[in-house]
């Protein structure tokens, strides 16, 4: 008798599982986007002619409310830290523009334009006099002067540097990840721009990133 009851229970359970239908869940409103937080342009005094697939490598960390990213490629090491922040770096991409200019796209978990952050950038020439510090200074924000960015350059290969936070444009052909990054930063008054030049005029360090081809940096 007990055996028959167990058998009937198993059959009933099997029948229920066959009749189960997937529940349609409501759509999410809090999508996990990559935010296009900053674009860094670096001019160098050696030839870089085109974007190389697999050239850029990255590592990132978040310690004591400081978000850090380290990028290597095209003869440079780029180390950037955003101090006292809730967000962290999630991705980066690099592309080569005209006149030996390297463009770096930086993506974070949150937008930068809501709170002014202090930023630290160290650029090291890996193959040309990397032990000599060429530049080490704080740069005030050239648009609104609400935050600062200290830039250290080790080596003699850098001709200019320009950093723009919360850019308002991006290459329309950049599709990593497709439809999951934001760049329509409408609050112009909260954006930042920093720049320093040595050989090139600073306006030569302002690339139109819509014209570049980028490759996403590989995580290490």
Curated annotation (Swiss-Prot):
It comes from the Viruses. The keyword Glycoprotein applies. InterPro entries: Poxvirus_M2. Coiled coil: none annotated. Induction: Expressed in the early phase of the viral replicative cycle. Residues 1-17 form the signal peptide. GO terms for cellular component: extracellular region; host cell endoplasmic reticulum. It is found in: Host endoplasmic reticulum; Secreted. Glycosylated by host. Belongs to the orthopoxvirus OPG038 family. Plays a role in immune evasion. When secreted, inhibits T-cell activation by preventing the binding of host CD80 and CD86 to soluble CTLA4 and CD28. In the infected cell, may inhibits host NF kappa B activation. Homooligomer. Interacts with host CD80 and CD86 when secreted. This is Early protein OPG038. It comes from Vaccinia virus (strain Copenhagen) (VACV). The gene is OPG038.
């Amino acid at each position: 008798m007990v055996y028959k009851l167990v058998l009937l229970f198993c059959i009933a359970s099997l029948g229920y599982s066959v009749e189960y239908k997937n529940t349609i869940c409501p759509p999410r409103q809090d999508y996990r986007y990559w935010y296009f937080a900053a674009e860094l342009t670096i001019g160098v005094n050696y030839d870089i002619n085109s974007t190389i697939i697999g050239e850029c490598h990255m590592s990132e960390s978040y310690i004591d409310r400081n978000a850090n990213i380290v990028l290597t490629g095209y003869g440079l090491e780029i180390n950037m830290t955003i101090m006292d922040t809730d967000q962290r770096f999630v991705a980066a991409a690099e592309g080569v523009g005209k006149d030996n200019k390297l463009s770096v796209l930086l993506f974070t978990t949150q937008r930068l334009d809501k709170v002014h952050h202090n930023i630290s950038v160290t650029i090291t020439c890996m193959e040309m006099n990397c032990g000599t510090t060429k530049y080490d200074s704080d740069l005030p924000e050239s648009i609104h002067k609400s935050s600062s960015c200290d830039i250290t350059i080790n080596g003699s290969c850098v001709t200019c540097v320009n950093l723009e936070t919360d850019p308002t444009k991006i290459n329309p052909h950049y599709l990593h990840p497709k439809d999951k990054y934001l760049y329509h930063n409408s609050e112009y008054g909260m954006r930042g721009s920093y720049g320093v030049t040595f050989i090139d005029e600073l306006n030569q360090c302002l690339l139109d990133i819509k014209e570049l081809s980028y490759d996403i940096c590989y995580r290490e």
